[in-house]
């Protein structure tokens, strides 16, 4: 109830409180299975419906989901410096807590290695918050102009028809996208998301092989 909302008298949960914002879920597999599966409707439609015996309530829930998880219970599966203590069955069961349909609604999947001492103690300059803000504002401005005559406000809300309308790729890019998604046996939803990301990169020093690179963001060891 705390995540999606509920109670005897329905109240909005965290996903509705994060409407038009960012919802960060750490240790994703540790959430209850039914709570995770309840995320599928709002991630798809931007709202959540809660039904109780005497009342049905619908709350807005269009948010950006950012989730983090280990790949196994001990946390060291895939670590090049420390051995994993989990059995193959334990690893499979742990990763299986995140269903395929839920993973399919998460646009980008990235494995992040643990930061080492040399990286943490480095004096090399990092991108500042002001620079990141500038990039975000630039992206938002592009989307506002793109969707000024539509009933959506960002790329993530595009339908398949709108992806085809706004995300024009060249012949070579289309062929690479087709090859990548066929080899990876991706769903129609994943195809649209990769297509959208390819078009975005097309505006920033895009190369055809980027389609294959972006497709890899949809598929990791899960």
Feature locations, PLM:
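Basic, amphipathic alpha-helical bundle interface domains used for macromolecular binding and assembly
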Residues: 9-10, 33-211, 216-222
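Conserved alpha-helical scaffold flanking the Walker A/P-loop in AAA+ ATPase domains
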Residues: 1-23, 56
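Extended, folded domain segments that form the structural surfaces/walls around functional sites
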Residues: 16, 30-31
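Walker B catalytic acidic pair
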Residues: 20, 26-28, 38
